[in-house]
Amino acid sequence: MSKGAVGLTAGYWPEDIYRYLAIPGISLDDGLITRPGRRRADHPAVISYQGIFTYRQLAAEMDQTMKAILSFTEGKSARLAIAIQQPLDLVKVIFGAVKGRCSLFLMNPSLPAHELTQQLDQFSPDLVITDDAHFKQEADSLPQRARVIQFQELEGKGTGIPVPRGRQDLQAPAIALALGDGGLVYHSHKSLLAGAVSWSTFVPLKAEDLVLGLQPLYTWEGLYSLFPVLFRGGTCLLASLEDPDRLARAVRNHRPCYSLLPRPEAAKLYRPVYSSVVQAFRQCLQGLFVSVVGPFTAAGRRRLRNLLQKPALLTYGSAESGAVLSSHPTWYLDAAVGIPLTNVDVWPLDPSNGNPLEVPWETIEYAEIGVKSPMTAADYQTPEKREKYIRGGWSRTWIVATMDPNGLFYLQSRIPD
């Protein structure tokens, strides 16, 4: 299928993969838990070292957690800062909070105190929920008025709390993520569901698939490991690289098809301590997606492919835009990062100021990548931040790239911020 036939500028598009796909007008909890659960109630939704939730169980835990959270907020929607390390508990809180129509900020529990202070000041939560005693101690000592509770305090709470009713604004800020420059970016139900639809369409993922999530859920890579496979009614194995032998056993037991790792994390696989993980990946994975934030070498990519004996599939994305460009399992070159994801349009911007150029990629040597898609952030911390990131309706990336006649993009350099 030619790219021209599906709305791109030139070149090739993978067969049987939609270029554009409508995003359902439903909430995140409905699209990822409730609706898949009607079809596959007893199918595993999330697996961790601590246990398994089927879709039926996760739906029940979501409802119970929602009511428990609302019992601490007088039954009203609130702003929640979440710093939970245990994966299954974190999943319960995320979906319980969004179903309760709360806005939440997914935090890194291991943040230094000064960063913790800065981020909590920016988000101004009504309630902080954590399972980390040190984090609670740090948060309690901060000069802010939010109540800090341990996750365990949610147990048994919420009896008699009514479920929120009425029309929900699916484009309002729902989940905040931290940006690299210290600010926050806000995603809506719509933008996060769009990411789930688009990534699961592009890869593609099916209801029979199991995806390995190795990144924390406060990162975009973590969310894109979990949400897309849930949208398809599949399973996510939530693990980490911290215990290589335990991870290797889990991979062999559950046999995931894909995983997504940032480049620095993927580089750890060369260390001798991860030899058992490498062997398990060789036996089970169909490919490893590696997210990059700038230029890379084709030789480095080939080295990783040779290590794993499986495709090293590169992806460029960010907290504000989600996945933007990616290798496809059936279509990639070693020197190219890939093609635009399903539902993603990219346009050349002037690298000197970020303004959209008046000519397409085919007519220029290089330009900054501008992004427009339903996955981009719903809002930023301040109007000044929004003005910095959005130019002429296109999201800036500060990445200079070039496009070849096949529509593949090559990352050239990063513009100093």
Which positions does each model-derived feature cover?
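Conserved AMP-binding/adenylation subdomain of ANL enzymes
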Residues: 193-210, 218-258, 272
